[in-house]
């Protein structure tokens, strides 16, 4: 499923997005963010992060730099170090 979602995002980025003007208010763009989020966090969490990002991408949001959050490590593994 992850590969299918990433392929759909790639198709959008290279086939559909060039036909429209650049409307994303964020860096990286929403499609780049979605690709990175799903690649990093998996389909479920990455998909949720992508949907939240798309919800923030509107004319009343100032936008700006909004990177994909890093993977959270468990407390027990960081305490063992």
UniProtKB/Swiss-Prot annotation:
* Gene Ontology cellular-component annotations: plasma membrane
What would be one Pfam family of this protein?
YidD
Task: Please give the chief subcellular localization of this protein.
Answer: membrane
Give its localization.
Answer: Cell inner membrane
Question: What is the protein's membrane topology class?
Answer: Peripheral membrane protein
Q: Which UniProt keywords apply?
A: Cell inner membrane, Cell membrane, Membrane
**Region labeled Disordered — which residues?**
59-81
List the NCBIfam families.
membrane protein insertion efficiency factor YidD
- Role noted for this protein: Could be involved in insertion of integral membrane proteins into the membrane.
As for family, the record states: Belongs to the UPF0161 family.
State the name under which the record lists this protein. Answer: Putative membrane protein insertion efficiency factor
């Amino acid at each position: 499923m992850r590969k299918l979602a990433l392929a759909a995002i790639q198709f959008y980025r290279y086939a559909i997005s060039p036909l429209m003007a650049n409307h994303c208010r964020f860096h990286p763009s929403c499609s780049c963010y979605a690709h990175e989020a799903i690649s990093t966090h998996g389909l479920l969490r990455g998909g949720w992060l992508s949907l939240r990002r798309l919800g923030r991408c509107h004319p009343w949001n100032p936008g700006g730099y909004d990177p994909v959050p890093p993977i959270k490590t468990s407390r027990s593994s960081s305490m063992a170090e």
